[in-house]
Each structure stands twice: as C-alpha cells, then as structure tokens.
Amino acid sequence: SRNQMVLDLSRDEVCEYVINAVSDILANANIGYAKRDMIRQLTDMPRLGYNHEYTLGYYKIMSAITEKFPNILFEGCSAGGGRFDAGVLAYMPQIWTSDNSDAIARLKMQYSTSMCYPVYSISSHVTASPNHQCGRDTSLKTRADVAYCGTFGYELDVTKMSDEEFEEIKAQIKFEKRIQDLMCNGDLYRLINPYETNYCSWEVVSKDKKHIFVMACKVLAVAQTKSEKVKLQGLDTNKQYRNTFTGKVYSGDFLMYHGIRANYEMKDFSTV
C-alpha cells in the first residue's frame, strides 16, 4: 500500500474537503502546472460499483478545480497506463504514460497508448541516460526522437550535461516547436509494430497532407541484414515531399507504395 491511505471520494464532504484544500494551495502560490500523481490502488471496496462512484467523485473535484483555475495546466498520472481515462481528459489534457521513461521501453508503450488516446495527451519526456529503472544507455537523439510523438519535455539534471548536449537540446526544442501543431492536430499512423519486429515506426500527417513527421527505430543491431522498409500512409499521391534533413524529394506515391529504407547507424537503439 506504499504507506498511503485512500480518501473516500464517493462522499460529497470528502470531495469538498479536497477541493478546498487544493484550491487554497493553488490560490496562494505562483503555479502554472500541477501533476496529480496517484499510485495507490483501490482494495477492499465496500460495495459493488464503488470504483465508479470514486471516479465520479474525482471528476467532481477536477471539474471544480479546473473551473477555478483555468490557466493552470493539470497533468494526470497513469501508473503504467492503468489510469489513462478518456473522461479525465476533459480536465487534464495530458497524462504521464509511465514512470518507465526509457526510450526503447516507450516504443511499445506509446505505440499501444496511441490506439486509444490522441498524441497530444501522451506525456513523453527525454530523461537521463543510463535510464534509472533499467540501466539502458541511449543517445540523446534517440530519446528525443521517441519523445517527439507526445507532449515532449525534459526530466534530467542539467548540471550534468555537456556544452555539446546543451546545443543538441536547443536544436531539439527548436524542431519540436516546428512540429507542435502537427502533433496536436495531425493524423497518426502506426507503420511498424514493435511487438512483432525489431523495428518501430510511426507517422503523423497534417490534415492538408502537406506536412509529415516520421520516426523509425531499430531496436537491436543485427549483422548482415537490411533494415525493414518503411511505407508511409495517408499522403497525397500527387504531392512532392522534401526531407528537411537531407533535402531529398519524394512523391507521395513513392513513399506509400515503394517506401524507403531508414538509414540507421550501425548500433543498437538507432532512430531516424
């Protein structure tokens, strides 16, 4: 139980207490962002349907608080995806996908979560490497490439970063701002399933089909093999698309029906 007790949110007086207590804190500090991090599960429920009553109480609390503080960004917490909830997105537009922020582990998490929830609701951050949970060492590029397809952010100790890493982060933030509208309003396509192959790829296409973002990842380096071809989806077959990194131009028809082989580095955990 993590030394935690659960408040009975099925009771109106408890909900009012929480609303008043949280509102008092938010009203007396310069707060622009708040994350609700709830890890304790419900056990020994007193009656059938109690979990539903509890959820309605939680919605009541968040409805009151967000109405009082419309300029604060609230983020939910998932504990591995279990608390992603379409209803709570009315109050918290983004949810922390998992405390496991390792970029390679996140491939499957974000791929799966995106089947039910929009890209802009999936909190995905660049965190320190080696990862604090699994010890995996991934490049700053790989961590950012995976995190772009979500809310994007950084969670690491900047005092331990080199000047070169700071410059790389500046470039990443500049790029993220370019694709921000695309991630919020574009259409997502899952191209390569990481559960079935050594690769993962997804794509976001703007509504007018003029702009696309594609991420492709090779999980493990394998000797004497060609990378899996990536075939895009949802493009205009009559349009020409320019790769902003290489300058190469491809037709939408070519990208969808012929596809391209990603130019991965010869190492594990490589992204393009």
Which ranges hold each PLM region?
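Carbohydrate-binding surface patches
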Residues: 194-237
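Catalytic cores of secreted or luminal carbohydrate-active enzymes
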Residues: 141-192
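A broadly conserved detector of short glycine/acidic/proline-rich loop/turn motifs that flank catalytic sites
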Residues: 40, 78-80, 153, 208, ...
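Hydrophobic, well-ordered secondary-structure elements that form the walls
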Residues: 37, 74, 147, 214, ...
